[in-house]
Swiss-Prot record:
Pfam families recorded: tRNA-synt_2e
Main location: cytoplasm
PANTHER family: GLYCINE--TRNA LIGASE, CHLOROPLASTIC_MITOCHONDRIAL 2, GLYCYL-TRNA SYNTHETASE
Catalytic activity of the protein: tRNA(Gly) + glycine + ATP = glycyl-tRNA(Gly) + AMP + diphosphate
Gene of this entry: glyQ
Cellular component annotations (GO), alphabetically ordered: cytosol
Biological source species: Streptococcus sanguinis (strain SK36)
The protein's name in its UniProt record: Glycine--tRNA ligase alpha subunit
Domain of life: Bacteria
The protein's enzyme class: ligase
Length: 305
């Protein structure tokens, strides 16, 4: 590799590449979440018959993974570059390899392996066939073909490509610690994120108010249900995300037992399933506006509209 791309240049390169493949460039969703998959730009749009092609960077918070800014590879918050394409292009893996070449990684010169790793997210009732992508022995990407999202079967199938930006940048820049990654010319990752990592880790493991969080979970769950009673899908899903993040904080604090943990996950999953069903029903009521006219008329006729 000749020029070592900065973190932001990696993002810009991926944005331009997937824009050229027909993806809309979305912005990060303004609610805490554990993965780019949980953004409504993936979770909601992966279900139903309408096409959807989008790419976006998603900061992803995982309180239990925080290490006070001291571990070179474990983070409270990391960044994913998320690509979702529905229906899935037949050449999606080839497109992915092309994107690596633009980042200076020639597939012919490196050991790139697709290692089977079927994916499941119990808290959202989602699952799919998947592969981890290993670059010279290090996982850099997760490939998933969704089979179920929010408890609903996906048709057409959505392909998801999730790049781990910190890992990818560490490899490209040949550094052993994420904190040594060059975010922009002259600015290191650690200069931006070391202190927030320390503070969020301290909060997650030592300072968070368990009683407050337990009460918040109950209130967020109730508000999600109230929104769903009013058929307000997007506000309801916002509260599902808040429930998920609140649970993750409780889990990191050790505030829930193994039995309670399963119960909390089931409660989040049940909400997510109702959100998914309500969203699809709403899109149908609107006449599936993202479908072309011929397909829309045929589908609505088949569904008895």
């Amino acid at each position: 590799m000749s020029k070592k791309l900065t973190f932001q240049e990696i993002i810009l390169t991926l944005q331009q590449f997937w824009n050229d493949q027909g993806c809309m460039l979305m912005q990060a969703y303004d609610n805490e979440k554990g993965a780019g998959t949980m953004s409504p730009y993936t979770f909601l749009r992966a279900i139903g018959p309408e096409p959807w092609n989008a790419a976006y960077v998603e900061p992803s918070r995982r309180p239990a993974d925080g290490r006070y800014g001291e571990n070179p590879n474990r983070l409270y918050q990391h960044h994913q570059f998320q690509v979702v394409m529905k229906p899935s292009p037949s050449n999606i893996q080839e497109l992915y390899l092309q994107s690596l070449e633009l980042l200076g990684i020639n597939p012919l010169e490196h050991d790139i392996r697709f290692v089977e790793d079927n994916w499941e997210n119990p808290s959202t009732g989602s699952a799919g066939l998947g592969w981890e992508v290993w670059l010279d022995g290090m996982e850099i990407t997760q490939f998933t073909y969704f089979q179920q999202v929010g408890g609903l079967p996906t048709h057409p199938v959505t392909a998801e490509v999730t790049y781990g930006l910190e890992r990818l940048a560490s490899y490209i820049q040949e550094v052993d610690s994420v904190y040594d990654i060059e975010w922009a010319d002259g600015v290191k990752y650690g200069e931006i994120f070391t202190h927030p990592e320390y503070e969020h880790s301290k909060y997650s493991f030592e300072v968070s108010d368990q009683d407050l969080l337990l009460g918040n979970f109950e209130r967020f769950e109730a508000e999600a249900k109230r929104c769903l009673d009013e058929h307000l899908v997007h506000p309801a899903y916002d509260y599902v995300l808040k429930c998920s993040h609140t649970f993750n904080l409780l889990d990191a604090r050790g505030a829930v037992s193994v039995t309670e943990r399963a119960g909390y996950i089931a409660r989040i999953r049940n909400l997510a399933r109702v959100v998914a069903k309500t969203f699809v029903a709403e899109r149908k009521r609107l006449g599936y506006p993202l479908l072309d006219a011929e397909t829309r008329e045929k589908l609505l006729a088949e569904e008895g509209e």
